[in-house]
Amino acid sequence: METRIVLVGIIVNDRTEISRLNELLSQYQDYIIGRMGLPHHMHGEKEISIISIAMEAPTDKISALSGKIGMLKGISSKVVYAG
């Protein structure tokens, strides 16, 4: 099956779902090339987390992960496809 290289950008506004996010990412670990997480304290506001996931996977796996992340409260994501 053909695979694609993608970057999944994730913003975590509500840390209550972070354990579920980590469980999802663990389920797709075979496709994940790398992961970078950055905590960020917004001026006068709460902390958010910015996470970048590089992955190579079939498009159905990419869509499935993105859809599952999108169902988590307080967490948003976007997928950018290479080429």
Predicted segments with their positions:
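Long, contiguous binding/interaction regions
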Residues: 1-83
